[in-house]
Structure formats: C-alpha cells, structure tokens
From Swiss-Prot:
<dbReference type="InterPro" id="IPR000298">
    <property type="entry name" value="Cyt_c_oxidase-like_su3"/>
</dbReference>
<keyword id="KW-0999">Mitochondrion inner membrane</keyword>
<feature type="transmembrane region" description="Helical">
    <location>
        <begin position="125"/>
        <end position="145"/>
    </location>
</feature>
<feature type="transmembrane region" description="Helical">
    <location>
        <begin position="13"/>
        <end position="33"/>
    </location>
</feature>
<keyword id="KW-0812">Transmembrane</keyword>
<keyword id="KW-0496">Mitochondrion</keyword>
<protein>
    <recommendedName>
        <fullName>Cytochrome c oxidase subunit 3</fullName>
        <ecNumber>7.1.1.9</ecNumber>
    </recommendedName>
</protein>
<comment type="function">
    <text>Component of the cytochrome c oxidase, the last enzyme in the mitochondrial electron transport chain which drives oxidative phosphorylation. The respiratory chain contains 3 multisubunit complexes succinate dehydrogenase (complex II, CII), ubiquinol-cytochrome c oxidoreductase (cytochrome b-c1 complex, complex III, CIII) and cytochrome c oxidase (complex IV, CIV), that cooperate to transfer electrons derived from NADH and succinate to molecular oxygen, creating an electrochemical gradient over the inner membrane that drives transmembrane transport and the ATP synthase.</text>
</comment>
<feature type="transmembrane region" description="Helical">
    <location>
        <begin position="237"/>
        <end position="257"/>
    </location>
</feature>
<dbReference type="InterPro" id="IPR035973">
    <property type="entry name" value="Cyt_c_oxidase_su3-like_sf"/>
</dbReference>
<keyword id="KW-1133">Transmembrane helix</keyword>
<feature type="transmembrane region" description="Helical">
    <location>
        <begin position="80"/>
        <end position="100"/>
    </location>
</feature>
<dbReference type="Pfam" id="PF00510">
    <property type="entry name" value="COX3"/>
</dbReference>
<dbReference type="InterPro" id="IPR033945">
    <property type="entry name" value="Cyt_c_oxase_su3_dom"/>
</dbReference>
<feature type="transmembrane region" description="Helical">
    <location>
        <begin position="36"/>
        <end position="56"/>
    </location>
</feature>
<comment type="subunit">
    <text>Component of the cytochrome c oxidase (complex IV, CIV), a multisubunit enzyme composed of a catalytic core of 3 subunits and several supernumerary subunits. The complex exists as a monomer or a dimer and forms supercomplexes (SCs) in the inner mitochondrial membrane with ubiquinol-cytochrome c oxidoreductase (cytochrome b-c1 complex, complex III, CIII).</text>
</comment>
<feature type="transmembrane region" description="Helical">
    <location>
        <begin position="195"/>
        <end position="215"/>
    </location>
</feature>
C-alpha cells in the first residue's frame, strides 16, 4: 500500500525522445533556412509529435485511471505550469527586446527609419485585426467552457471547447494566408526577421494550445473531468489566455505601432 501522497514517476522514454527531437528540430530548422535539411526537419517534427502523444497518454492514464494525481500532486502540477508559462514569457520578452532595440534606434544600414527603407508593412486594420477578434472570441469561449465544467454542464463545456478549437484553427489559417501574402520575407532586414520570428513563434504556441484544447475536448467528452477535478483543462485554459495576451502585445507593438 502507498503511504505517501506523491506520485513516484516510473521510467519513461518520452523525455529522452522529446529532447532528441527538439535538438534535431533546431538543426533541421537552421539547415532549412539555408535551403536544405527539410528531411531532418520533418523527421524531428514527427518524433516530437509522437513523443507528445505518447507522453500525454501516459499522463492521462496515471491521473484519470490510476488515481496518482492527488491534491498535493495537482499543486505541484499547478506550480509547474506557472513556471512553464513564466519561461515562455521570457522567450517573448527577448523577441520584443530585439524589436524595440531595432525600431527605437534604427541604424544607417536600414535607412535610419522604421519601418526600414523599402519595407511595406502589413495593414494592421485588415487581417491582423480580424485575428485579434478571433483570439479574443476564443478566450471568451474557453472561459465559458471552464465555468460550464465547474457547474457540471458537460455538454455546454464540450460545445464551448469545439468553438475554441475551431477559432484556433481559423486563426492559424488566417495567419498562414497573411504570411503567403506578405510583401516582405524573413530575410528582408531586421524588420522581416523580428516580425516573422515573433509572430511565427506565437503561431507555434497557437498550434500547441489548439492541440492541448483538442485533447481536453476528447477528455471532456469521455467524462474524464469533474466539477472539482479538472486541472488538465485549467492548464490548457491558462496557456490559451497567455497566448491571447501575447497576441494583443504583438498586435499593438509590431502590427500597429511598428507600421
């Protein structure tokens, strides 16, 4: 019989495979920027996706079917998620720092102006504004889902999560179309680099958050969550609100002020 409230995690290959996949992904991405290494990038992405699916499956099994996620374990998971989001905030602070460092004191190499000479920025009141409305609406629907879960309304929570995932997919579709129609590329001065790195990294977070919420949707449909025990969903909702806040900052700083 277990006489302590903590979950003693068993051996798992997924941290190792995820690390290998992330390392290979970085190498493949750098190679892809130089017009080769796409196969390496694809294999690394496949390894990461498989590792995520298997790791997520293990966590769901341990928490839902084996009962390892006690109140103390859940508290640890909460702090872990808070620290993870804090580390993500530091990522985006670095991108904003690079953007403002370049825009507030433009160098002669880019014409001593911002946007740089020859760069035609995107209209902040077209697709970017629509993307903002889409993400804000998704923040409302994920909050609706959370309150429905706490009230024991599983059907309402399921409907709200379906809307949230659809809005996340629509945002990704709009962002991809914006990238294809952009009159500049990632190689067009520091403006193009900071724009595509910052917004692209946010787009990656939208994909991850949409996957997170899709898993929560499947778990909600399968009766995995109760009114008092649904931290898996809470973590996804925290992450999604973080994605919303970052996008508002990106819109105001890069799309609106930066143009």
């Amino acid at each position: 019989m277990i006489r302590q409230p903590f979950h003693l995690v068993e051996y798992s290959p997924w941290p190792l495979t995820s690390s290998i996949g992330a390392f290979t992904l970085a190498i493949g991405l750098a190679s892809w920027f130089h017009n080769h290494g796409f196969l390496c990038l694809t294999l690394a992405a496949f390894l990461i996706i498989v590792s995520m699916i298997q790791w997520w499956r293990d966590v769901v099994r341990e928490g839902t079917y084996m009962g390892h996620h006690t109140s103390l374990v859940t508290t640890g998971l909460r702090w872990g998620m808070i620290l993870f989001i804090t580390s993500e905030v530091m990522f985006f602070l670095a991108f904003f720092w690079a953007f403002f460092h370049s825009s507030l004191s433009p160098t002669p190499e880019i014409g001593c102006s911002w946007p740089p000479t020859g760069i035609h920025p995107l209209n902040p009141f077209s697709v970017p504004l629509l993307n903002t409305a889409v993400l804000l609406a998704s923040g409302v629907t994920v909050t609706w889902a959370h309150h429905s879960l706490m009230s024991g309304k599983r059907i309402d929570a399921t409907q709200a999560l379906i809307l949230t995932v659809c809005l996340g997919a629509y945002f990704t579709f709009l962002q991809a179309g914006e990238y294809m129609a952009a009159p500049f590329s990632i190689a067009d001065s520091v403006y193009g680099t900071t724009f595509f790195v910052a917004t692209g990294f946010h787009g990656l977070h939208v994909l991850i958050g949409s996957s997170f919420l899709a898993i929560c949707l499947a778990r909600t449909w399968s009766h995995h969550f109760s009114a008092g025990h649904h931290f898996g969903f809470e973590a996804a909702a925290w992450y999604w609100h973080f994605v919303d806040v970052v996008w508002i900052c990106l819109y105001l700083c890069i799309y609106w002020w930066g143009s």
